[in-house]
UniProtKB/Swiss-Prot annotation:
GO cellular component annotations of the record: extracellular region
Lineage: superkingdom: Eukaryota
Disulfide bonds: none
Chief location bin: secreted
List of residues that carry Threonine amide: T11
UniProt lineage: Eukaryota, Metazoa, Ecdysozoa, Arthropoda, Hexapoda
Family recorded in the similarity comment: Belongs to the periviscerokinin family.
InterPro entries assigned to the protein according to its UniProt record, in alphabetical order: Periviscerokinin
Listed name of the protein: Periviscerokinin-1
Function: Mediates visceral muscle contractile activity (myotropic activity).
Pfam families membership: Periviscerokin
Keyword set, alphabetical order: Amidation, Neuropeptide, Secreted
Coiled-coil segments: none
Subcellular location as annotated: Secreted
Length: 11
């Protein structure tokens, strides 16, 4: 998920 500070695979 890209719903964080950095668009990783986590939320």
């Amino acid at each position: 998920g890209s719903s964080g500070l950095i668009p990783f695979g986590r939320t």
